[in-house]
Amino acid sequence: MADFDNLFDEAMSRADGAIRGVMGTEAKVMSGTLSGATLVGVFDDPENIGYAGAGIRVEGTSPTLFVKTSTVSQLQRMDTLTINGRQFWVDRVGPDDCGSCHIWLGNGTPPASSRRR
């Protein structure tokens, strides 16, 4: 287990591990450096209730995968994943927080342009 600055961070890391263990879903990496690897994380696909104009990102409407940070250190933008038989692509990997992070996903195949949408 990693060294933590305080007991709270250590407790949060343990809680996150328990949550991933109980609620975790397998995500198969289909492309990139981690191709063939299986990640375990909590998958959240919120209902998309509206659309913003071009070039506007609305936080909270993209699917996410909550994972252990050390397992995704080589995951890159545009890598593809299969979760529950559906294809997704990596939009971005969030910062580490007590050993865990969120991966924001796009639905389907990655866009032709690598420019962030």
Swiss-Prot record:
It holds the Pfam family Phage_attach. Coiled coil: none annotated. Keywords: Capsid protein, Host cytoplasm, Late protein, Viral capsid assembly, Viral release from host cell, Virion. InterPro entries: Phage_Head-Tail_Connect_sf (IPR053734), Phage_tail_attach_FII (IPR008018). SUPFAM superfamilies: Phage tail proteins (SSF69279). GO terms for cellular component: host cell cytoplasm; viral capsid. May bind Head completion protein and Tail shaft cap. Plays a role in virion assembly by joining the head and the tail at the last step of morphogenesis. Six Head-tail joining protein bind the DNA-filled capsid after binding to the Head completion protein, in turn binding the pre-assembled tail. This is Head-tail joining protein. The gene is gene 10.
